[in-house]
């Protein structure tokens, strides 16, 4: 670029800083989606992603300054961008090569997510971090106004980061998919590098080396199926997959959100509930209401629509309202999971916002099934949300919640008992078995101002299951309820309460 006028060169330097910063944030946002099928999405996952990429960026900034002080020119910028493109493209192959051994290791979820991010995204972050200080130094050779040049470059880097964040999060992920974004970013980095490599002397060996690297990257990625997208659909919230199930039950399909099977739908009969916690919720409603044929249901969370589908099939005169955050989930349930949305009112939006908008509605049963794996929307665990539910319930209505927590000392479940007890007379916790070793477990919590629950609940239909009321056992063992907080909008330390799931093998 030596033939350009200084103003044009400075403009191109600024554009490169803007774009390289944007690409780094594109990778950061995509990292969360790319890793979701393996480690899910949680505060700790995002902490690993942000921390590793910032560490790489910091190291890259330091290296860029050192390289610039040694007199590096535009060719160094081009080489850095080209190597960054290769590192970016290699993410797809590395993911598949790292996934199998890492998933087989007995590491905590926190360690696993950190290793994934470090292996895949640290090097691209370092390389892209080199660009800004290197180009800032080159710009200062053309414009001696240090403050203006440095300020402009920092501003462009920040604006690029903002643009990359919003473009990826709001549009790219749900439009083209995460793996396509990775490939497009690598190609864009190559194109960005080319003008800086104009003066680079490609000797025969160097040109051959570049070709070999490109062929090797593409071949390895194809060999390990790195180009294959594991998601049937990618939305703004989930990587969605549908898995066919074969067994004595007949044709069945399961919905997988990120890395966890959410629920399983049997084609016929629709009211056969295979997932134990969904079955438990259904049986609790039937125990509470001897004649459930005309009940008014509100479901917070649709997912595979397993429970709403069963209710509507069994009781056509029941009123069923479902709040589902993600329209793509509803689309997949309708097209792939035997769900017929007719006669069910579906409101797409956050469950708390939707329920708040139904001020003139009253429900006999409110079923909250939104706690996906360990990604728990804290605002649906607080006393303010429970108070809202209470205002929408019939006087003796039933409130049901499923919660993923550790066994045998589920501190989040206990905190929810304490929080719910301030609003409801009877609060009970249900499990279908007691594991022999510490592990993760799905609990069902019921709350009502109506009748007390039994100590044991036998299934009246479907699989021959029994659920046990362990409320008193939880209160008498492990962490005391008095040592746990009542959850509120102001203070709901969900991640701390379920930290055992992140820091031990029980969370895997």
Model regions and ranges:
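SAM/dcSAM-binding transferase cores
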Residues: 445, 449-508
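Short alpha-helix immediately C-terminal to the canonical SAM-binding loop
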Residues: 330-331
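Short, conserved SAM-binding/catalytic segment
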Residues: 334-344
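Short, solvent-exposed loop/turn elements at domain surfaces
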Residues: 250-253, 262-266, 454-456, 482-484
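Short, solvent-exposed loop/turn segments at secondary-structure boundaries
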Residues: 268-269, 377-380, 411
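Class I SAM-dependent methyltransferase Rossmann-like catalytic core
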Residues: 264-288
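Alpha-helical transmembrane segments of multi-pass membrane proteins
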Residues: 1-234, 244-251, 259-264, 286, ...
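Short acidic active-site motifs
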Residues: 354
